[in-house]
């Protein structure tokens, strides 16, 4: 029997790091060699993640300055944006595969980083090397890749909702797409803030960064790859009262003489090979439930749907995902599987939780 792949996790005490540990605990081909945390260094993994008590019994958090990058086969970077970019580059240069869950290698245009993330990228030469880890579009490129950039959760949902519209060219590209996103509180991470604490988040719904969310740049980059031209896209997220999940609604104007039947073909064709996207067309008289985050929680599944408003000539694409699994740790494990030659769904076959 071949030895297990040795993995290291940078930033393993946050919500994304915890979800990554949860998924890897059931992966038969991976052993976590080290997991870093500044706050919990020297303490067991379950100190930060009590639901993992009984797993990783011999593993304690370590500080970044004590890790040996070269002793692992793959590094997952779950550190805050900008913090781990140089460590990722070091791992890459030492022949270690890297799966980056931060935004540090998602965008190929280095000029966007100061504007969107507040730092000058330390290794712009590696931006073109990173494969954007969205299986439905870049799955083939992930196989054997050395550096994978895990999409943002809002970007994942936005792209899944809008990609069939763009790829099929059934919408007016010059008018563009407006994406409305409903985002759960876990998207804000484990550190409490003025707007993320329960008394202020529960029962609330509010927009945030409506003047140009960072994840819009990811969506534009991917949609441009699909059609080979620029596209206008606005993404406005809303903080809503749920713990997990993202629901994206992508609004666009159909081209003349395009209707429901063309939309059915567009979505069916785009997702025909996907094992984890459930396509749910919506129209009067169709006995189909709409995409719902409740149907995908805890899983890699995405529910995608669309509706056509004949009177206005508009179409809305929808996508519901779990922000911590499909929008983060699950896509990271999928990328690792593809990069290292595992079955791509190893460790990811769990059905969703409901209710």
Curated annotation (Swiss-Prot):
GO molecular function terms listed in the Swiss-Prot or TrEMBL record: N-acetyl-gamma-aminoadipyl-phosphate reductase activity; N-acetyl-gamma-glutamyl-phosphate reductase activity; NAD binding; NADP+ binding
GO biological process, one term: L-arginine biosynthetic process
Cellular compartments per GO CC: cytoplasm
Enzyme class name: oxidoreductase
Pathway annotation from the record: Amino-acid biosynthesis; L-lysine biosynthesis via AAA pathway; L-lysine from L-alpha-aminoadipate (Thermus route): step 3/5; Amino-acid biosynthesis; L-arginine biosynthesis
PANTHER family assigned to the protein according to its UniProt record, in alphabetical order: [LYSW]-L-2-AMINOADIPATE_[LYSW]-L-GLUTAMATE PHOSPHATE REDUCTASE-RELATED, N-ACETYL-GAMMA-GLUTAMYL-PHOSPHATE REDUCTASE, CHLOROPLASTIC-RELATED-RELATED
Protein name per the record: Putative [LysW]-L-2-aminoadipate/[LysW]-L-glutamate phosphate reductase
Organism: Aeropyrum pernix (strain ATCC 700893 / DSM 11879 / JCM 9820 / NBRC 100138 / K1)
Gene name of this polypeptide: lysY
